[in-house]
Structure formats: structure tokens, C-alpha cells
């Protein structure tokens, strides 16, 4: 498979660029510790709110091409004017099922002796998680149990109902129950965790759950 990268669904290979390398390091967790005199262990607040938050994702993409300086400048201008300083969706051909979101900056360099030009695209403010390209949609007709499978990123689904519907689910030891009419709903308490999440639906019509999964 030819290494490529898509930015906002545009293949950079089709613009004449070869992808030399990509660097997508894992974002670090947001940590906050307090050292207390007399204690042998610090007070850690990494999971103080019940879940872990992460630093912005940083990544770098190195592109190259062979040609004259004029050709290089033209190709650089095409990429820079489209994407530099803009919030973009980035998909690598190695992992086409997920995408990153972040603001791109560009740094070109050209060697007249070899005729090789390079363009480095970098991001320092990317979303921590990589998102699934395809939105997850689960539809239930009538009443019954629904299992919502989720990747590692916690996410709150959008619930669409076509009539009077009652939803019931459990988070840890706490139970929740919501009765709604036809419409579109979001319940912060219905945050899906990694793995399988079960809910009970009581309805005569259709109930649809939509959410976008993600992972580090």
C-alpha cells in the first residue's frame, strides 16, 4: 500500500507529494500532584474528576517531492493556502479507520543541489483522541435490550425516538431512567464507557443511538 495522507479528505499524493514519515506520539495525561511534607507519596489529581484527561495531541507529517524550485513552490503554495493555520481532519493510509483533528502549520525546505523539496506539516493543538471515520448507529425497533459497543473514548450518544419511549440503564451502582416523547435527545448521564454498554428500551416505535467512537 502506498503511504499517503488525506487532509480534509484530499489525498496529498494526488497533489504530487510523497509521504516520507508520520509521527503520532501518544498524548500525555493531564497530571497535577501536590507534594506534602511528611508524606512519602504525593497527592495525585490525575483522576480527581473520575476520568483521565489528556494533553493536546502533537503530530508531524513529512512530505517530499523531486522537481525544480518553481514546481516545488507551486506545490507548497497549493497545500499552504488550503490548510496552513486551519483546523483540519487528517487521515493516514496506515490507519484509514480513524482521523485526527488539529490546526496545521507548514514549513517548506528545498535543496537546489538534489532538486528535492520537503514540506513538514505539524500540529501542536490536536484533539487528544483519534476519532472513528464512521459514526456508530444502532437502531432498536420496539422494546428490548440494546447493547452499545464503544471504543476507549467516553462518549454521550444522541438518541432519536419516534414516539413515547422509556430508557433505563445503570452506571456503576447508580440506576437511571428517562421517559421522553418523539424527538432527539442527549443525556449526559448516558456516557458510554469502553466495551459493551447495555440499556433497556420500552417503546412502540424506533429508537436510534448515534455516536462517534474514539481512541488514543
Show the residue positions of the predicted features.
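Extracellular Ig-like/FN3 beta-sandwich strand-entry sites
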Residues: 56, 85, 192-196
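Mixed-charge, glycine-accented linear interaction segment located at domain edges/termini
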Residues: 6-11, 124-128, 191
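Intrinsically disordered, low-complexity segments enriched in serine, threonine, and glycine
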Residues: 129-216
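Short, solvent-exposed beta-alpha or beta-beta edge segments that form flexible loop/patches at the rim
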Residues: 24-58
Amino acid at each position: 500500500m502506498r503511504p499517503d495522507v488525506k487532509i480534509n479528505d484530499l489525498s496529498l499524493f494526488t497533489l504530487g507529494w510523497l509521504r516520507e514519515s508520520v509521527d503520532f506520539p501518544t498524548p500525555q495525561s493531564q497530571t497535577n500532584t501536590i507534594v506534602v511534607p511528611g508524606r512519602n507519596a504525593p497527592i495525585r489529581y490525575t483522576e480527581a474528576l473520575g476520568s483521565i484527561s489528556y494533553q493536546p495531541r502533537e503530530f508531524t507529517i513529512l512530505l517530499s517531492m523531486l522537481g525544480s524550485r518553481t514546481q516545488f513552490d507551486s506545490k507548497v503554495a497549493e497545500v499552504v493556502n488550503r490548510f496552513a493555520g486551519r483546523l483540519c481532519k487528517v487521515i493516514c493510509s496506515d490507519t484509514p479507520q480513524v482521523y485526527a483533528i488539529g490546526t496545521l502549520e507548514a514549513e517548506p525546505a528545498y535543496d537546489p543541489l538534489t532538486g528535492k523539496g520537503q514540506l513538514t506539516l505539524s500540529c501542536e493543538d490536536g484533539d487528544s483522541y483519534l476519532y472513528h471515520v464512521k459514526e456508530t448507529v444502532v437502531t432498536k425497533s420496539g422494546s428490548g435490550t440494546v447493547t452499545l459497543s464503544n471504543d476507549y473514548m467516553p462518549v454521550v450518544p444522541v438518541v432519536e425516538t419516534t414516539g413515547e419511549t422509556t430508557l433505563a440503564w445503570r452506571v456503576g451502582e447508580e440506576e437511571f431512567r428517562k421517559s421522553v416523547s418523539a424527538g432527539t435527545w442527549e443525556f449526559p448521564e448516558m456516557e458510554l464507557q469502553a466495551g459493551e454498554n447495555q440499556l433497556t428500551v420500552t417503546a412502540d416505535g424506533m429508537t436510534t443511538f448515534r455516536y462517534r467512537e474514539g481512541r488514543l
